[in-house]
Amino acid sequence: MRTLSAEIEIYPLHRLFTISRGSKSETIVVTAAILDGSHTGRGECGPNARYDETPESVLAQIESLGPDIAAGMSRAQLQDALPPGAARNALDCALWDYDAKQMNTPVWEQAGLSAPAPL
């Protein structure tokens, strides 16, 4: 059975990051992990206040789908379960990563894309 874990992580920046609307000295990331005892799929997101997201609200959205993830929620089902945003991004990435590891197939291959190559 799959389980879902998620947490808020704070990373200090090496130096102050400044753009026209402000400065910040740290970045806040919400991580999601889907585990089954053998495989772990990981995803992350950066909540954006512009879209009324806080780290806590995004974490709550992710955690609310714990029972659905345990029941086998697919990437397609996720699209209907959450609106576009940071939480859906983190879980979508975690599901892609989980499926890739479980099937021992790279994500690019699952998506029907060409193998990545240097630019």
Language model regions located:
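N-terminal capping/lid subdomain adjacent to the active-site entrance of alpha/beta enzymes
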Residues: 1-119
